[in-house]
Amino acid sequence: MSVREKMLEILEGIDIRFKEPLHSYSYTKVGGEADYLVFPRNRFELARVVKFANQENIPWMVLGNASNIIVRDGGIRGFVILCDKLNNVSVDGYTIEAEAGANLIETTRIALRHSLTGFEFACGIPGSVGGAVFMNAGAYGGEIAHILQSCKVLTKDGEIETLSAKDLAFGYRHSAIQESGAVVLSVKFALAPGTHQVIKQEMDRLTHLRELKQPLEYPSCGSVFKRPVGHFAGQLISEAGLKGYRIGGVEVSEKHAGFMINVADGTAKDYEDLIQSVIEKVKEHSGITLEREVRILGESK
């Protein structure tokens, strides 16, 4: 029995797509094929896929909703798991529990509907709840670490564990999940009671700021670089004269130099080449070495 036949038998009922192009699913609109793209409907299907992959020695990874990543043009071998169907969100008092695939922006809107404060900072951050925990996503002075109460994960060995914020060892755009290989299943956020109108006004203010400053009209991978201590990446790039700098179909945004946008059918290689070139030119200009925030995954073509 071939691996494909065994997969279809053991993982019957699970949505699996073979040799699926990933550019359709990424915010950058680039990326080659996944050998097996999987859409589990619940944590049990996810656990079945991970168990099968481990037993068959097939590599696997979870992409969240592919908002802060670049998939290389050669694609990704093995299983790529998208969790956007694991998207239930519930509210219990001042606590919101969200599955990993829940949309982060929509989760902040649910907090607003229940007049819960603390989540406003994330009202414009694209991505999934699971991805936000993985990266300790943040903006405008807030971050996931400030509101996370606990997190349920599937370990790389297929066990389910509940972790505290302390267990996750949050840092700037970092969590322990990045090293552990675990997969976020669901998250509990501890919020506080607030006034609906006040929360809405703050979310509207932050959304307006984001629309003014960020090139939301183009495909992009979000913030490309981490914030250097004492500096802003976008400012350093701008001071090096790199706004509008372009390689292939990808360019440094004129609107916000911390973003790289796909303006003309760019490729993952265009992104990688532009990122490396910007790092080198900023280093030459300011002496500061920028560090990538965006993850680059897969194989070159």
Swiss-Prot record:
Location(s) in or outside the cell: Cytoplasm
Record-stated family: Belongs to the MurB family.
Organism encoding this protein: Streptococcus pneumoniae (strain Hungary19A-6)
Gene: murB
UniProtKB keywords: Cell cycle, Cell division, Cell shape, Cell wall biogenesis/degradation, Cytoplasm, FAD, Flavoprotein, NADP, Oxidoreductase, Peptidoglycan synthesis
InterPro entries (alphabetical): FAD-bd_PCMH (IPR016166), FAD-bd_PCMH-like_sf (IPR036318), FAD-bd_PCMH_sub1 (IPR016167), FAD-bd_PCMH_sub2 (IPR016169), MurB (IPR003170), MurB_C (IPR011601), MurB_C_sf (IPR036635), Oxid_FAD_bind_N (IPR006094)
Name of the protein described by the UniProt record: UDP-N-acetylenolpyruvoylglucosamine reductase
All residue ranges annotated as the FAD-binding PCMH-type domain in the record: 30-194
Coiled-coil positions: none
Reaction(s) catalysed (UniProt annotation): UDP-N-acetyl-alpha-D-muramate + NADP(+) = UDP-N-acetyl-3-O-(1-carboxyvinyl)-alpha-D-glucosamine + NADPH + H(+)
